[in-house]
Amino acid sequence: MRKLFSFGRRLGQALLDSMDQEYAGRGYHIRDWELRKIHRAAIKGDAAEVEHCLTRRFRDLDARDRKDRTVLHLTCAHGRVEVVTLLLSRRCQINIYDRLNRTPLMKAVHCQEEACAIILLEHGANPNIKDIYSNTALHYAVYNKGTSLAEKLLSHHANIEALNEEGNTPLLFAINSRRQQIVEFLLKNQANLHAIDNFRRTALMLAVQHNSSSIVSLLLQQNINIFSQDLFGQTAEDYAVCYNFRSIQQQILEHKNKILKSHL
């Protein structure tokens, strides 16, 4: 079992690295030859040129480039508020997908373009659409430490318990991403403390796995169940022992002793 945890630790670090590549707020990789004239104008934020293109060919309003990105996707990824407003006033498709099933709202959140995201939400963008990884806009806000964006999404009825393909709610995702401020924010907004992922790992197990003693402390204060077992019958305390995280093991042990004393 110790070997399994050792492997899990290396795998966990690899996953963190790959997560940073996938979820960090980067825009689209743009090649000029993939774009139409209207796409180029939108990326530059040239609202007058975009309007000129639409006057000539109105059907270009939702035109896709060679990677299935619409004008609105590209505009949101680059934070071109004036062009976003223009496109919405012309009634472009607001919940349209790109090749990864991401909507313009997802892309605005992914790239941390808050002004664009707010405009989209105020025009009725759906915050609960999932991409090919089953992530929602809230998952991307969580990864990019966006409490302001997360709050805005929740105020527009984003599902705080949405599951991605790994079974992670935004809370579990925040713990996996080591985002303590977001963890605190989600708990204050009534996120389910007892959520489990596809391996039946609890929030506490994930916090232990990532050696996040401050998040462990926060979860213990919330009286999370320390006796829950994952798919392999391991508890959060077992995780601390196998990873040799002695200070976290001590935190859990002290909490366990308090529970046992209260039942005497």
From Swiss-Prot:
InterPro entries: Ankyrin_repeat_domain, Ankyrin_rpt, Ankyrin_rpt-contain_sf. Gene3D superfamilies: Ankyrin repeat-containing domain (1.25.40.20). Signal peptide: none annotated. ANK repeats lie at residues 67-96, 100-129, 133-162, 166-195, 199-228. The keyword GTP-binding does not apply. Keywords: ANK repeat, Repeat. Pfam families: Ank, Ank_2. PANTHER family: ANKYRIN REPEAT DOMAIN 36-RELATED (PTHR24147), ANKYRIN REPEAT DOMAIN-CONTAINING PROTEIN 19-RELATED (PTHR24147:SF64). This is Putative ankyrin repeat domain-containing protein 19. It comes from Homo sapiens (Human). The lineage of its organism: Eukaryota, Metazoa, Chordata, Craniata, Vertebrata.
